């Protein structure tokens, strides 16, 4: 697994946990990585670069949540955000953050990573759902945004 993929997965877990327990996402991210380090999940280790990338993603999503959610709501024509699975919504939030605020990451990389994370953490139809909405959003993002 690449460092950035690991970072995206950690960020997803932190944002998802934040939604469930209404706790600060950075605190959740720290707890997730500490539990791995303490051996609760001995097969997982947290790379410091992955943690830094996850932290950047979490902070970016939280800081820009209104703009990100607005884009998602605008392009998810037949789905209210309240109806979306929390995992799918947070995968979308992470990817939309990358599309809007990380022009150094190619759009196709962001989309592919989101789809792969959706396959791993989401339901059977999550990958196609995420792909459909991200495709709509990506088509409206200019390189200057």
UniProtKB/Swiss-Prot annotation:
Domain of life, source organism: Bacteria
Signal peptide limits: none
UniProt keyword annotation of Transcription regulation present: yes
Any one annotated GO CC term: cytosol
One of the GO BP terms on file: transcription antitermination
This protein's UniProt keywords: RNA-binding, Transcription, Transcription antitermination, Transcription regulation
One MF annotation (Gene Ontology) recorded for this entry: RNA binding
Annotated family: Belongs to the NusB family.
Described function: Involved in transcription antitermination. Required for transcription of ribosomal RNA (rRNA) genes. Binds specifically to the boxA antiterminator sequence of the ribosomal RNA (rrn) operons.
PANTHER family with a match to the protein in the record: ANTITERMINATION NUSB DOMAIN-CONTAINING PROTEIN, N UTILIZATION SUBSTANCE PROTEIN B-RELATED
Protein name: Transcription antitermination protein NusB
The organism of origin for this protein: Citrifermentans bemidjiense (strain ATCC BAA-1014 / DSM 16622 / JCM 12645 / Bem) (Geobacter bemidjiensis)
Encoding gene (name): nusB
């Amino acid at each position: 697994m690449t460092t950035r993929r690991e970072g995206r997965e950690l960020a997803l877990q932190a944002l998802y946990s934040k939604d469930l327990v209404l706790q600060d996402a950075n605190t959740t991210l720290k707890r997730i990585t500490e539990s791995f380090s303490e051996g609760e999940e001995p097969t997982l280790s947290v790379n410091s670069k992955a943690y830094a990338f996850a932290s950047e993603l979490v902070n970016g999503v939280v800081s820009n949540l209104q703009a990100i959610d607005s884009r998602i709501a605008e392009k998810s024509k037949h789905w209210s955000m309240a109806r979306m699975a929390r995992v799918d919504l947070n995968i979308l939030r992470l990817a939309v953050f990358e599309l809007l605020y990380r022009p150094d990451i190619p759009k196709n990389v962001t989309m592919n990573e989101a789809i792969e994370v959706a396959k791993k953490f989401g339901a059977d139809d999550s990958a196609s759902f995420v792909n459909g909405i991200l495709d709509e959003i990506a088509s409206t993002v200019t390189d200057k945004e």
